[in-house]
């Protein structure tokens, strides 16, 4: 029988609450750095936790807590197609987009879901080949050179993170066949800026909306249609691809578009980058070969996440450490720093992934909980952020745990030697220096120059940021968030918190504000400029 208890009801969490953090200054040795290291997918992508404030005693309690909370058994429920998203009575099938690990998952209409995702994937590959070969051309007979994805939230953040992570790698390996762009915000300046910067005659547009009725996406789609028409493109649907649910408004009512690819309601937007939501654009921009490597990395990491041993399961251990830091040590945020310009959009995806998933105040049974849930997720790119907010991280009054991400080699393989070292060596040296500085600090009798240290961090690293590596890292964070949700006893797969604002916005747009003085007053100031 699987145990669904609140975090503070678990006996091993009560034990964990009494355990002090490890003192990093005294234990951070070469031996520890070597031993406190796990491969995320069993091969070349590593998670190192030597600079976390834990020791063997913590690890023992983590193991007992994981076993008590049945974390691996709950993961297996997801893989086997149980309706884990209980508030919406849905399965959670994003793992199935990159390979089958559990039992056959059969939907109510008798459809095998792995076969559904695989057939969509083959359709994506075939469509990309037709575009690349020039067999499918624009409305005016031009070969497509650009792709613009229009969507918001998970229809933009994850795909954009993967696109920017892989773009330079694809260029170096002659696999960058089209240029990718994104429009997400309802601010018309964004649509205008993107559309005015490209040749529309040579651009394919991907419209992503699960329901087919997303406010921002509908508005931006209409902006696009107007732009296409004003450029003399009457058959504008020949340049538009739709990604949506099979039974959505877009699928049922809007016909004649170049192609339709289908999502499934068992996958929330923030977990959708390895579905059609992310893969259509990636296959068009970077080819089938790149997509297959992303899926391979994610699938291998998914499989390794089944390991019951917390010392050999990176996302499971990362989740347990996160709970310890949030609910015992009271650290309220987590900073993601990638020492790779290509990953500049990745922490933005992780913000949504973690905060939308676990930013809840009721448990899976709709009961109010009395312990902390998700941390604030934020971040940036090294070394840039060393010259902005690292002052606060080093000497501020709040301790902020960090995830560092780094790679041994660059993607474009171009560099320069200055002051007897390459720029890439300088980049890596700064990454190492920050981990040590945060962990050990440096005493100084001048309080203004004193560094206390004891700022914990983890390091994810690999030889190079490849499609395989980014797939593995994506899976790591998805599964970490999942395990955190299990520990917190919340439903990580719904997002009721986004609904109220949508409802009020529609009310304001309909001028239905007279019953609320605050809404009416703000409307006069901002909308009507009274």
Curated annotation (Swiss-Prot):
Question: For this protein, what reaction is catalysed?
Answer: alpha-D-glucose 6-phosphate = beta-D-fructose 6-phosphate
Keyword Phosphoprotein in record: no
The cellular location(s) given in this protein's UniProt record come to: Cytoplasm
Q: In which pathway does it act?
A: Carbohydrate biosynthesis; gluconeogenesis; Carbohydrate degradation; glycolysis; D-glyceraldehyde 3-phosphate and glycerone phosphate from D-glucose: step 2/4
**Key words of the record:** Cytoplasm, Gluconeogenesis, Glycolysis, Isomerase
InterPro entries, per the entry: G6P_Isomerase, G6P_Isomerase_C, Phosphoglucose_isomerase_CS, SIS_dom_sf, SIS_PGI_1, SIS_PGI_2
By its UniProt entry, which SUPFAM superfamilies does this protein fall under?
SIS domain (SSF53697)
What is the main EC category here? isomerase
| The enzyme's E.C. designation | 5.3.1.9
**GO MF terms, alphabetically ordered:** carbohydrate derivative binding; glucose-6-phosphate isomerase activity; monosaccharide binding
Q: Name one GO biological process term.
A: gluconeogenesis
The lineage's top-level taxon is Bacteria
Active site, UniProt feature: 356 (proton donor), 387, 502
GO CC entries: cytosol
Which Pfam families does this one have? PGI
User: Per its UniProt record, what NCBIfam families does this chain match?
Assistant: PRK14095.1
The record's section on PANTHER family has: GLUCOSE-6-PHOSPHATE ISOMERASE (PTHR11469:SF1)
The family line of this record is: Belongs to the GPI family.
Per the entry, what this protein does is:
Catalyzes the reversible isomerization of glucose-6-phosphate to fructose-6-phosphate.
Q: What is this protein called?
A: Glucose-6-phosphate isomerase
Question: To which species is this protein native?
Answer: Borreliella afzelii (strain PKo) (Borrelia afzelii)
Gene name linked to the record: pgi
């Amino acid at each position: 029988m699987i145990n669904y208890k609140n975090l503070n009801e678990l006996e091993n969490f009560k034990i964990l609450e009494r355990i002090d953090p490890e003192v990093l200054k005294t234990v951070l040795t070469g031996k520890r750095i070597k031993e406190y290291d796990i491969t995320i997918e069993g091969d070349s992508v590593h998670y190192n936790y030597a600079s976390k404030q834990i020791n063997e005693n913590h690890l023992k309690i983590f193991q007992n807590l994981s076993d008590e909370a049945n974390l691996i058994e709950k993961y297996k429920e997801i893989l086997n197609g149980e309706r884990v998203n209980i508030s919406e009575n849905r399965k959670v099938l994003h793992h199935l987009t990159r390979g089958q690990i559990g039992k056959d998952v059969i939907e109510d209409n008798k459809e095998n879901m792995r076969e559904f995702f695989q057939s969509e994937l083959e359709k994506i590959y075939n469509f990309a080949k037709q575009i690349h070969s020039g067999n499918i051309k624009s409305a005016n007979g031009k070969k497509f050179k650009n792709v613009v994805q229009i969507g918001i939230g998970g229809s933009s953040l994850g795909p954009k993170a993967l696109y920017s992570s892989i773009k330079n790698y694809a260029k170096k390996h002659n696999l960058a066949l089209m240029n990718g762009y994104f429009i997400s915000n309802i601010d018309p300046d964004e649509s205008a800026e993107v559309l005015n910067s490209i040749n529309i005659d040579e651009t394919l547009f991907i419209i992503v909306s699960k329901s087919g009725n997303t406010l921002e996406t509908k508005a931006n789609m209409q902006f696009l249609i107007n732009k296409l028409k004003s450029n003399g493109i009457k058959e504008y649907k020949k340049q538009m691809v739709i990604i949506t649910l099979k039974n959505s408004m877009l699928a049922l009512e809007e016909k004649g578009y170049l192609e339709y690819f289908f999502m499934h309601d068992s996958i929330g937007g923030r977990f959708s980058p390895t579905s059609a939501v992310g893969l259509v654009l990636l296959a068009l921009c970077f080819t089938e070969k790149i997509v297959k490597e992303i899926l391979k990395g994610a699938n291998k990491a998914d499989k390794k996440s089944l390991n019951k041993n917390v010392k050999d399961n990176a996302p499971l251990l990362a989740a347990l450490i996160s709970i310890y830091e949030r609910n015992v040590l009271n650290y309220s945020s987590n900073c993601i720093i990638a020492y790779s310009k290509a990953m500049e959009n990745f922490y933005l995806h992780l913000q949504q992934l973690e905060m939308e998933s676990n930013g809840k105040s009721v448990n899976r049974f709709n009961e109010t909980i009395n312990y902390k849930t998700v941390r604030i997720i934020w971040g940036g790119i090294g070394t840039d952020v060393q010259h902005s907010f690292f002052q606060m991280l080093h000497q501020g009054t709040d301790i902020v745990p960090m995830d560092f991400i780094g790679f041994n080699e660059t993607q474009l393989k171009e560099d320069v030697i200055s002051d007897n070292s390459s720029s890439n060596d300088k980049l890596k040296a700064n990454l190492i220096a920050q981990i040590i500085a945060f962990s050990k600090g440096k005493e100084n009798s001048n309080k203004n120059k004193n560094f206390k240290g004891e700022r914990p961090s983890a390091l994810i690293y690999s030889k190079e940021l490849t499609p395989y590596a980014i797939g593995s890292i994506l899976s790591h964070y998805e599964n970490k968030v999942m395990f955190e949700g299990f520990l917190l006893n919340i439903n990580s797969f719904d997002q009721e918190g986004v609904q109220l604002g949508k409802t009020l916005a529609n009310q304001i747009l309909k001028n239905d504000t007279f019953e609320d003085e605050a809404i009416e007053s703000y409307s006069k100031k901002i909308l009507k400029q009274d």
